[in-house]
């Protein structure tokens, strides 16, 4: 058994680590709440843009924007949203598993895949496993803006415009609740249609557009896709902070359990030392 002095040193070291993980847990909780607020703030704006797109598309029914036109899919683009840092449990590894599963499924059906990566962890992963990377960006921080990653988005939109890819998807972690985050693959292009959209397009709005509806649609559709990517990035950050908070709480709890174990070992070592000293005193007295 280790000596009492050595055990006390270990207890002190673990206690310092526990203070650090506790502080990191609190910071992650604070960042998660702020990111959730940004998530909520962007949704009404995105919903309203989508409504406007549907109205304008109805007004310019003779014009089929490439983003809204189905085509034969031979090559698929995917934007993979990951974190820059670790210490967030299995968040990235779960996302990578889902991404690889999705890519392999497409490849089994004869589709080629082009990839754009957001986040250092994704860059490192695809350098290791390989893949046709069209663009990447990292170091977005905890409060990114659309301008921070607009270059990567533009690369993929240009690839869609010129026919290099025929479909565009994004994969990111979906925030279910503080304890649960799961990988989610979402189609961006061509713009998916729902039954509700078909009902909406069946109505007529008599609006006058300035500039023309076609010009508005060209501009707004790009902004909408950029906003979809922004929402995915922000939601992924919320997932990162939630996972980090849980991981740090687990580390703090484990440190507490270790301290209890070492404290018990320290008490036993101290008791053994005292017993030894008493035995030596008694033995010395008996010798006299």
From Swiss-Prot:
The gene is atpG. PROSITE patterns: ATPASE_GAMMA. GO terms for cellular component: plasma membrane; proton-transporting ATP synthase complex. One of its GO terms (molecular function) is proton-transporting ATP synthase activity, rotational mechanism. It holds the Pfam family ATP-synt. SUPFAM superfamilies: ATP synthase (F1-ATPase), gamma subunit. GO terms for biological process: proton motive force-driven plasma membrane ATP synthesis. Produces ATP from ADP in the presence of a proton gradient across the membrane. The gamma chain is believed to be important in regulating ATPase activity and the flow of protons through the CF(0) complex. Keywords: ATP synthesis, Cell inner membrane, Cell membrane, CF(1), Hydrogen ion transport, Ion transport, Membrane, Transport. This is ATP synthase gamma chain. F-type ATPases have 2 components, CF(1) - the catalytic core - and CF(0) - the membrane proton channel. CF(1) has five subunits: alpha(3), beta(3), gamma(1), delta(1), epsilon(1). CF(0) has three main subunits: a, b and c. The keyword Chaperone does not apply. It is a peripheral membrane protein.
């Amino acid at each position: 058994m280790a000596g009492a002095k050595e055990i006390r040193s270990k207890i002190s070291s673990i206690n310092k680590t526990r203070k650090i993980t506790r502080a990191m847990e609190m910071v992650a909780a604070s960042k998660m709440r702020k990111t959730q607020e940004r998530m909520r703030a962007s949704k009404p704006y995105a919903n309203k843009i989508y409504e406007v797109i549907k109205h304008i598309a109805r007004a310019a029914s003779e014009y089929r924007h490439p983003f809204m036109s189905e085509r034969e899919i031979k090559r698929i683009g995917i934007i993979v949203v990951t974190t820059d840092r670790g210490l967030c449990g299995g968040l990235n590894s779960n996302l990578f598993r889902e991404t690889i599963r999705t890519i392999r499924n497409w490849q089994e059906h004869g589709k080629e895949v082009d990839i754009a990566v957001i986040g250092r962890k994704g860059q490192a992963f695809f350098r290791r496993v390989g893949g046709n990377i069209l663009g990447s960006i990292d170091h977005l921080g905890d409060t990114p803006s659309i301008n921070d990653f607009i270059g990567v988005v533009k690369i993929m939109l240009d690839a869609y415009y010129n026919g290099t890819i025929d479909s565009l998807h994004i994969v990111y972690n979906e925030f279910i609740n503080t304890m649960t985050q799961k990988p989610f693959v979402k189609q961006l292009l061509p713009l998916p249609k729902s039954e509700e959209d078909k009902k909406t397009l069946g109505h007529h709005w008599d609006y006058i557009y300035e500039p023309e509806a076609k010009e508005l649609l060209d501009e707004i559709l790009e902004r909408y896709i950029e906003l979809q990517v922004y929402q995915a990035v922000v939601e992924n950050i919320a997932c990162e902070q939630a996972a980090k908070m849980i991981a740090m709480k687990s580390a703090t709890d484990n440190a507490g359990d270790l301290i209890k174990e070492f404290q018990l070992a320290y008490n036993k070592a101290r008791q053994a030392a005292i017993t030894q000293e008493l035995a030596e005193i008694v033995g010395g007295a008996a010798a006299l």
